[in-house]
Amino acid sequence: MNRLFILFVIGALFLASCKRDGSSEQSSDLDIPDEVVNEGVQELEISEEVMQDIVQNISSPVEMAALIKSLDVPFSAKYLASVDNVDNYTTSFQQAFNLGIFGADLGFLNMYNKTNSVINYISAIKTLADGIKVGQFFDFVTLKRLAQTNENLDSLMYISVHSFNQVDKYLNTNQRGNLSALMITGVWMEGLYLATQVYKEAPHDAIKERIGEQKIIMGDLMLILENYNKDKQFAHLVEQLNELKALFAQVEIKIIPGEPEAVEQDGMLVIVQNEESVVTISDELIGTIIEKTEEIRNNLIGS
């Protein structure tokens, strides 16, 4: 399931950054009259090499939750965004971003088998998805049934990830890559927030290293967001995240090459270059990153 979630994030980053052909005409029932539609904004292309770097380094919220759980850190609902705020998200900018936030929280809840809370987050996701007119891609009846019966949590995760994949594909093919970028930013932001909050209460080197590694993916994510910087809301988002990026710039990451390894992927033998990353981040710096992450995340979700 972790690999599926990673592919969802990677695909969204890739599609949001590539030039797209085709008519800009959309059916009226699918138009979203909001202030984040990017008209006349030149889009950037991300090279395949850069995308491979993202694949190698991104940490999905599911991976982060799995790491946290493996360290015997007890579950705490206080880390999660409150579903009580969902009705306050009235613009598609807010709805797309918080769709990512709640999607990350859903992965965290699933990892800890908190099925009672899962239902509330599925309902919140439905509200936000309907708000940007992508609710048709979520089978909410099946999702709630799986959550209520505690039946096959792998299936619950799979359907959730597949739904987000469909949403991303739809947004990008309908000239709404900006909303996809917001959704992915929400996913990443919440994953980082969860990690930093856990580390604050239960410091562990593995979590500290994973936090430091976010320096890499943040650089790529900022390229995508800056693509929509002509919109004032995106400009404000980028301005806030640049403060965090400046802190991550002080994190040192050294890549140590390892021995190549032959592995089977999709029935084919491929050579994988193993690498080890050594992250150097001071206690003072990670403390500042924790504070800044909390400040930005809470400001963005309105808590």
Task: Go through each PLM region and give its residues.
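Extended amphipathic alpha-helical interaction segments
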Residues: 152-238
